[in-house]
Amino acid sequence: MSRYRGAVVRIIRRLGELPGLTRKTTRRNSRPGQHGDQPRKPSEYAIRLEEKQKLRFNYGLTEKQLLRYVKDAKRIKGSTGEALLQLLEMRLDNIVFRLGMAPTIPAARQLVNHGHICVNAKRVSIPSYQCQTTDVISVRNNARSKQLVENYLSFPGLANIPSHLEIDKEKLVGKVNGIIERDWVALQLNELLIVEYYSRKG
């Protein structure tokens, strides 16, 4: 399944606020579609599927990518759900977003793809690059790159930078000081239901 490129508003009407995907919000409580206003009790499968979709759309992942992250999280000692979130939060496109260098993860992904971002002084153009503690995230030393990020920093997607990150806005340099704590994950979801979803699929 490829990455979603359709109408963002339909997604947030169905799944709720997705801060990584878009700044847009919707006041309508009903789901999209002809029968969106008809109340119905979702099945347990539907609830687990919805939580999985929240995660996939927020971080801009394909189904194949998310499945790989779930498998990687299961190999990590401790809570699989929390490990999954930590892996996703350490993606370079997400780190750029959480530092305020881009208003959304898709915008951050574009910065990375176009070569505007460096990790430890080396240009990295892979959005899924897995950042490590002590990594230094900087902006490529040219006028175009700096102008883009300076504009984004004036209107960050999220108000607060997580405690495991820091940024020098004048130098356009950020640093990863550790692993994100669960409370700092901006997306509202139950990650245990996602682990259950994949466990039941076998």
From Swiss-Prot:
Region (Disordered) location: 20-43
SMART domains assigned to the protein according to its UniProt record, in alphabetical order: Ribosomal_S4, S4
Main location per the UniProt record: plastid
GO biological-process terms attached to the record: ribosomal small subunit biogenesis; translation
InterPro entries assigned to the protein according to its UniProt record, in alphabetical order: Ribosomal_uS4, Ribosomal_uS4_bac-type, Ribosomal_uS4_CS, Ribosomal_uS4_N, S4_RNA-bd, S4_RNA-bd_sf
GO molecular function per UniProt: rRNA binding; structural constituent of ribosome
Lineage: superkingdom: Eukaryota
Localization of this protein: Plastid, Chloroplast
Annotated Gene Ontology cellular component terms: chloroplast; small ribosomal subunit
Occurrences of domain S4 RNA-binding (ranges): 90-152
UniProt keywords, alphabetically: Chloroplast, Plastid, Ribonucleoprotein, Ribosomal protein, RNA-binding, rRNA-binding
Record function comment: One of the primary rRNA binding proteins, it binds directly to 16S rRNA where it nucleates assembly of the body of the 30S subunit.
NCBIfam families per UniProt: PRK05327.1, rpsD_bact
Description of how the protein assembles with itself and partners: Part of the 30S ribosomal subunit. Contacts protein S5. The interaction surface between S4 and S5 is involved in control of translational fidelity.
Family in the record: Belongs to the universal ribosomal protein uS4 family.
Name of the protein: Small ribosomal subunit protein uS4c
Classification of source organism: Eukaryota, Cryptophyceae, Pyrenomonadales, Pyrenomonadaceae, Rhodomonas
Primary gene name: rps4
